[in-house]
Each structure stands twice: as C-alpha cells, then as structure tokens.
C-alpha cells in the first residue's frame, strides 16, 4: 500500500504539478498517506451492521433490513459485496484503501496471517470507483481446491459468476508455488482521474468499442452425439469443457485425472 500511494502521489505531481486535484467537480488529494479501512469497518461505519462471523442467512436478513437487493443465488461473498457496493463504495471519494476482505469474497487470495476468516487483499477507491486491486496469492493447493468446491456449490445455486474447478491450476500448486503477490491498476481510469475526464472514451487511443466476447456452450445433444451420457454433460461443462471440440482436443489420460480430481 505504501508503494501504491507513493507512486500515485508522484504521478499526480508529474502530470499536474500538485497532489490536489479536481475530479468531477470534487477536490481530491493524492497526498500520501491514504486512509486505510477494513471491509468490516467500512460497512459498520455506513450501516451500523457488523458482518464479523455472520452466517449466510444472517447476512441475507441484513440485506433485507438494509433494503439491499439480492437474490437466492448469492452466497456470503456476494451478499457482503452487495452491502458494500450500495452503502460504501460511492462514498469513498478521497483515496481510501479497503483491506482485509472476507475469505468468501476472494477465492484466489491467501488467508490473512492473523485471521483465517479474512484474506490478505486490498482495493484502492478514488471518487467512488475502484482503482487498484491487490492480494497475496493463495499457494496452498488443498485450500484452493476447497475454495473452488465452494464456488461450484454457488454455481449449482445459479450464480453465473462463480468459478469452475480448474484442476490444472490446483495440480500446478501441488508442485509448489513460492509466496507471491500482485496488483492490478486501471490505467485508463487513472488517466481519467489525472486529466479530469468523465468518459473513458476521451483517454483511449483506440476508443471504438469492440464487440464483447461471448461464451459458447454446446447443447447436451452435441455431447450425447459423440457417446457422452446426458447426465455427465453438466459435470463436464462445470470442469470447463464447454464445447465438444474442447473435449475432442483433450488427451484421455488428462481428462481421467481431471475428472477424478473433480469428484474429490
């Protein structure tokens, strides 16, 4: 976080000659240090509700009391995110680090070294928008597989944003991955902030919108036509093989290993 705030302070000085900027008519200071606030404290500050140790049912009831719109597919992570998104995100005008995300919100993040219910993750918000996302990478294959299995349960509930079980990734972790971390910064959004532009189109070199890439799923009939029993089709697609062509390209031994690992 210190690196991030110092970098952005230097960027503001290099571009504008000052750390005191005006963005969308609001005065915003990029002078380090930035405010630090845990996810739990941010929600408590704006709603009075403490998410610590709450079950999915308790969080769902809290959303109802707070008039946060959710549906039955939401797990704990999305319920917390919905509360944060409605009550907190747009209020974070001055640069603010939100830290210590609950584990359910971050399926690829390492558990917090002092609280296993949280993760070592932070996001930086400026002018009510996310600018950076950073975390320590989860490198424990057992923990990662359990997280993927939880994502599978959410997918079975109807959450179309839940991850599938990536057995190649889990197997790679079993060979060993050193401790590491990373951060992603929205460079286009940062450019908007530094130049006080309200539209991303004004800061892109090539502003023409490209059509969105669509995910193609073959129907069950395409699988049964090559001899796959119909009851196995949902399982195979949850493993990430969404088309018959992707299945044809797969070595039988690898598919067998993936399937065995998936069933575990």
What are these regions (language model features)?
Residues 212-264:
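Compact, charge-rich alpha-helical regulatory domains located at protein termini
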């Amino acid at each position: 976080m210190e690196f991030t705030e110092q970098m952005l302070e230097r960027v503001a000085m290099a571009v504008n000659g000052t750390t005191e900027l005006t963005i969308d008519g609001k005065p915003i200071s990029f002078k380090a240090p930035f405010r630090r606030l845990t996810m739990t404290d941010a929600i408590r500050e704006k709603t009075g509700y403490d998410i610590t140790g709450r079950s999915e049912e308790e969080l769902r009831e809290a959303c109802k009391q707070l008039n946060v719109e959710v549906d039955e597919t939401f797990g704990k992570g999305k319920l917390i995110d919905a509360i944060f998104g409605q009550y907190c995100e747009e209020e974070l005008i001055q640069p603010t680090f939100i830290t210590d995300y609950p584990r359910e919100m971050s399926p690829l993040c390492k558990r917090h070294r002092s609280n296993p219910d949280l993760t070592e993750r932070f996001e930086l918000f400026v002018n009510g928008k996310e600018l950076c996302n950073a975390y320590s990478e989860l490198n424990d294959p057992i923990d990662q597989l359990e997280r993927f299995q939880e994502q599978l349960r959410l997918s079975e509930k109807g959450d179309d944003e839940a991850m599938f079980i990536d057995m190649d990734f889990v197997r790679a972790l079993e060979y060993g991955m050193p401790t590491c971390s990373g951060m992603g910064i929205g460079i286009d959004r940062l450019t908007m902030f530094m130049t006080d532009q309200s539209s991303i189109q004004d800061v892109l070199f090539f502003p023409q919108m490209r059509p969105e890439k669509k995910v193609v799923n073959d129907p069950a009939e395409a699988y049964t036509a090559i001899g796959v029993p119909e009851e196995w089709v949902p399982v195979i697609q949850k493993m990430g093989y969404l088309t018959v062509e992707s299945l044809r390209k797969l070595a039988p031994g690898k598919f067998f290993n993936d399937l065995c690992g998936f069933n575990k």
